[in-house]
């Protein structure tokens, strides 16, 4: 695959108002993607655009709109809406393209652009390369004549539509009556729709992270900072806590004791429940190289398989589609239930967990830990430039670490696709050895990254 100049593992992402997350780049994305997804017939073409609650969304959105309308595409604006909601609305409105403006779990200063095809799935690497090629060419050719410019309209009921779609995924005849739930929306895109969905299903809802101001998205809240959720669960004696990230495509949960449960455990719970109901497809689960070995062992004990992909929920979804799987995701909390959505959806995954809990006579603490994870250690090393992983010293440290584990665990070292970080992960039954090999690899990376 050719090297991509703009797109990473999850669209284009970076600090707002710095390359590549500038108004100029957003304009070029709109023009290039618009040209690529407009067919040659004379019908009107449509793109839908949603965003999270970052201040910079007000800069990126009009730049994208200018790009799309300049090549003749009509635009529908949703305002704040979860990423999976944008994917759903792309399909339901029969749009040619869907766009989400978000940097997911990142700090407010970052932003990003994610693109969805007319089928509601994230674009392939090949499509992103085609867009990049058009962005780097002269874009003045093919501009719409004044009478063919795109028209723009704001859609006011998209949040209500998403709530209804989410509620429809909950088992018929079941409600959340009698359940007390803490929901942390990370001051992000789901700040209205997630609490409303739970409330309309009958739950008593304690809300946090529902006062976005443009700057506080993911700030000490949401799935990357679950302490706020855990504290409130214990304070209000809730049955469960749910924490979403800024664009609500991932989640973590906690039990009634405030103990946090990651994406691996959530996938195990849903897969086990669906397998018992005869609903699980593909004979197992798709996850990434970062998922815990304990998940693999848990599934194997139930005659189910774990298939691994590179990091990135779109790669998980691609493998799910190829192999006919309907449960997949990432340890970080992207959980994809392809019967229900075309991308990771934190709220829909939470509803499936809540259904299992409501139908059980056991507390969440008895359901949450489906398997015993093997000791796993992850460290991130920030670097300025260059390719630390190609350095001989790092390669030597990796080879020595593999020898020391001697087949009793796994090592995954990779460059982040969204931040200037090298992620070093090791896992195995010997916790002390795992910590040692991570320390040695991190030390080697730091030396060459300095």
UniProtKB/Swiss-Prot annotation:
EC number: 5.4.2.10
Phosphoserine: residues carrying this PTM: 104
Pfam family, one: PGM_PMM_IV
CDD domains on file: GlmM (cd05802)
Modifications made to the protein after synthesis: Activated by phosphorylation.
Catalytic activity: alpha-D-glucosamine 1-phosphate = D-glucosamine 6-phosphate
GO CC annotations on file: cytosol
UniProt cross-references to HAMAP family, sorted A to Z: GlmM_B
Name of the protein this chain belongs to: Phosphoglucosamine mutase
Organism: Phenylobacterium zucineum (strain HLK1)
Gene behind this protein: glmM
């Amino acid at each position: 695959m050719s090297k991509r100049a703009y797109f990473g593992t999850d669209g284009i992402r970076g600090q707002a108002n710095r390359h590549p997350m500038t108004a100029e780049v957003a304009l070029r994305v709109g023009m290039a993607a618009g040209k690529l997804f407009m067919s040659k017939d004379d019908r009107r073409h449509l793109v839908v655009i949603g965003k999270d609650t970052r201040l910079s969304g007000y800069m990126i959105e009009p730049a994208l709109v200018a790009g799309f309308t300049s090549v003749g595409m009509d635009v529908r604006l949703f305002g704040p809406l979860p990423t999976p909601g944008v994917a759903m609305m792309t399909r339901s409105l029969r749009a040619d393209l869907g766009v989400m403006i978000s940097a997911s779990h990142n700090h407010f200063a970052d932003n990003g652009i994610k693109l969805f095809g007319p089928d509601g799935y994230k674009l392939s690497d090949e499509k992103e390369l085609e867009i990049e090629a058009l962005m780097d060419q002269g874009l003045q050719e093919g501009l719409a004549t004044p009478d063919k410019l795109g028209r723009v309209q704001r859609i006011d009921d998209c949040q209500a539509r998403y709530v209804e779609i989410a509620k429809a995924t909950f088992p018929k005849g079941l409600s959340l009556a009698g359940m007390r739930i803490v929901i942390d929306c990370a001051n992000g895109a789901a700040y209205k729709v997630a609490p409303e969905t739970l409330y309309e299903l009958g739950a008593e809802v304690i809300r946090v992270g529902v006062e976005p101001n443009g700057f506080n998205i993911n700030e000490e809240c949401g799935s990357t900072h679950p302490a706020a959720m855990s504290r409130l669960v214990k304070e209000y004696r809730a049955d469960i806590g749910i924490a979403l990230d800024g664009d609500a495509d991932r989640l973590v949960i906690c039990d009634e004791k405030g103990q946090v449960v990651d994406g691996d455990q959530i996938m195990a719970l849903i897969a086990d429940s669906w397998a018992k109901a005869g609903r699980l497809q593909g004979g197992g689960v798709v996850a990434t190289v970062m998922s815990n070995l304990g998940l693999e062992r848990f599934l194997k004990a139930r005659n189910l398989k774990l298939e691994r992909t590179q990091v990135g929920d779109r790669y998980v979804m691609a493998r799910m589609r190829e192999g006919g799987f309907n449960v997949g995701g990432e340890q970080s909390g992207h959980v994809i239930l392809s019967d229900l959505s075309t991308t990771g959806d934190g709220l829909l995954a939470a509803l499936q967990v809540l259904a299992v809990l409501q139908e059980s006579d056991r507390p969440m603490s008895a359901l949450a830990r489906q398997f015993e994870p093997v000791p796993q250690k992850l460290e991130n090393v920030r670097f300025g430039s260059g390719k630390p992983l190609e350095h001989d010293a790092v390669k030597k440290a990796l080879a020595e670490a593999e020898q020391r584990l001697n087949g009793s665990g796994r090592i995954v070292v990779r460059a982040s696709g969204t931040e200037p970080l090298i992620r070093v992960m090791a896992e195995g039954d010997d916790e002390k050895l795992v910590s040692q090999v991570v320390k040695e690899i991190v030390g080697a990376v730091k030396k060459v990254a300095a």
